[in-house]
Each structure stands twice: as structure tokens, then as C-alpha cells.
């Protein structure tokens, strides 16, 4: 199982988990982040709630951060990643200087 902390505007917003590679994902908002109403949800399609969001595919707010087409092939080849490993790719490219307010940092075990 791979995990990543999701930051929104440099504040810890929640935890993204891949339970089954390529098929099972969970996003859980950080309780303190939700309590501060000056913070925004990570996506309009994922409003604040205490229950985890679960999906059979990586949530669109995160897949939209990934390169596409020829750029994806080049990036995956250079990092020796499977082009279908969206979570692995997210962990490599979304750690800093992203377009938008969200960054993602892998939780090391």
C-alpha cells in the first residue's frame, strides 16, 4: 500500500492511499484542515466530509495533474515507471512547483 500526504496551499489537507495498485484509492481529509473554514476543499467534487472518499480509479483532481501523451511517455521512461502507474507518477511529479494549489508527498515507511 502506498500513501501520500496531500497539501493544499502548503497546508496538510489529507491522506491519499492506494490500497490496490491501479484499482483502489482512498482520500481522507485531515480533521484539523476541515475545521478551519478558511481552507478550501482539494476539489469541488470532493467537498469536506469526515468519511473517506473511495474510488476504483485515481481521483480526477489528481489525474489532472499528470502529463499526457508523448510527455507522459518521456517522463515515465526517464523514471522507469509504467505509464499506467498513475499513483507512482503522481508521487514523482507532484511534489513541488505544480500548476495549482495542490502538492503530494509520499509517506515513507
Q: What are these model-derived regions, one by one?
A:
Residues 1-109:
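Phosphate/dinucleotide-binding and metal-coordinating scaffold of catalytic cores
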